[in-house]
Amino acid sequence: GVSKPFDEVIKHFGDPHAFGQPPVSSLRQLLSCLICPSFLEEPSYPKDIKEKARRILEATEHFSIGSYTDSLGLRIVREHVAQFITKRDGYAADPGSIFLTNGGTTGIRIALAALATGCLCSDKNKAGLMIPIPGFPHYVARIKQFNMYKIPYYLNEDNNWALDTCELERVLDESRPHCRPRGLVLINPGNPTGQVLSYDNIREVIKFCAREKLVLFADEVYQETVFTNEVQFHSCKKVLRDLGPEYNKFQLMSIHSASKGFYGECGLRGGYIEVVGFSKEVLAQFKRYLSPPHKAPSTAGQAAVSAICNPPQPGDESYETFIKEKMSIMDSYQRKAGITTKMLNSLKDVSCNAVTGSLYAFPKVILPQKAIEEAKLNNCTPDEFYCWQMLEATGINSIPGNLFGQKEGTYHFRLTILPSEEKVVPMFDRISKFHEEFIQQYRSDKDN
C-alpha cells in the first residue's frame, strides 16, 4: 500500500480497554469466581470478593451464571443498584423500579420503544422526543427505528454546553403540529461535549419537563467519570427529590452502565435503567414488555453492574487495591483532560470548552473558505474533510462534528482523552503541525 507519514492509527472512540486501560481487579475477580466457582476456594482472592460472588451464585439457578435469570435481572443485583442510588442521592431507591440491561444502549432502546409503542402512555399519535445537539447518535437511530419524531434542541456552547430553557420552549412549540411530544433526553456528563451540568441547570430542566408533561430520560452513563474538584455530578433523581413532594409524580427514567468511567468494561454489556414516577399499572406494562425470560440480560453483564454498584469498602480485604487502581485511572484522566483542553485552545481558530467529565473533547474549528469549497468538491462536509485530512496526515482518527449534530455554519470534531499519557503530547504535536499546515494551505485573503 501507499506509505503514510505515521506508524500508528489512533482511533478516537470511547472504549477504555481498547486503549490499554487496565481492568479493575475487584470486578474481574468477582467475574472469574462467577464463571469458575472453584475460584471461591482460591486463597489468593480477597475474602470479600469471594463472599459477594457466592451470594450472587446462590441467587442463580443451580449455582451457575449460565442459566437464564428473571427478565428484569437478578434481584440481588437490583438490590445492589438500589443501595448505590440511595447512597449517591440520599433518597431511597426501590429495586422493583430497577431493570438490568445489556449495556446502556439497550436501556435506551427499551425506554424509547416503550415511549413509542404506547407502553408508557395511551396516546396513539406519533411520539416526539427532544434530543440534544450535539448528542449521542444512537438516539437518532432509535428514533428512526421506532418511527418517532425527532425534536432536536441545541446545547449552549457559549455557556459550557448548558441546556437553555428558552431553546427548549422554542423547539417544543415548533414540534407540536407534527407529533405528540413525550420525552426529553438529557446527557450528563456530556457526550460528545465533555461537560458536567450544574445543579441549577438540571433543576430548570426538570421544572420545564413538569410544566410540559414530558418524561425526562437521563443518560448518566458517565456519572463516575468526573475528574475535577471544580464540578460535581448531580443525578436527575437527586435534584428531583430535592424539589419535594410536589414532584412525586414526575416521570423520570435514568440509565447507567459498566462500560464507561474508570471501569470501562464495554465488552461485558452491563447496565441498568431506573424508572420513577410511573403508576403501578404502567410499571406492570413495562415489565410485561421485558418478558419473557429469554430477554433476560447477560448474567456476566449483571455481575459487572453489581461490581460498580457494590464496590469494595474501607475495611474490605480488596479495598486498598481497588482505591489505588481507581485513583490511578482518575488522576490520569484529569491530567489528560487538562492537556487536551490546553492544547486544543492553543491552536489557531480552534476553541474548546474545558473537559470536566465523560471521556471527550468537542472543539470548534473555524475553517477557511477554500477548505469548505474543497470539501464540496469531495462530496463531504467541511468537518468530514478536515478530519479526513487529519487522518491522512497524522493517523489520528477524530470524529467529525456532523455525526453528533452542530449548529449550521459551525464545525467541530470529537477527540477522546483515552490514549495513554505517553502518547497524548506526541499526538497533539502531530495535530498541531497538521492544523497549522492545513490552515496555511487553504487560507486566502478572504479569511483575514
Where in this protein do the model-derived segments appear?
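Conserved core of the PLP fold type I
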Residues: S25, L31-R211, F217, Q223-E246, ...
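Conserved core segment of the aminotransferase class I/II
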Residues: S26, L30, C36, D48-I56, ...
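Short catalytic/ligand-binding loop motif for oxyanion handling, primarily in non-cytosolic enzymes
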Residues: H17-P23, Y139, P192-Q195, E212, ...
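Generic structural signal for small/hydrophobic residues in well-ordered secondary structure
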Residues: K11, V81, I98, L129, ...
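Eukaryotic N-terminal low-complexity, Ser/Thr- and Lys/Arg-rich leader segments
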Residues: G1-F6, E167-P177, P245-E246, E317-T321, ...
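Active-site-adjacent capping/gating segments
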Residues: I372, P382-P426
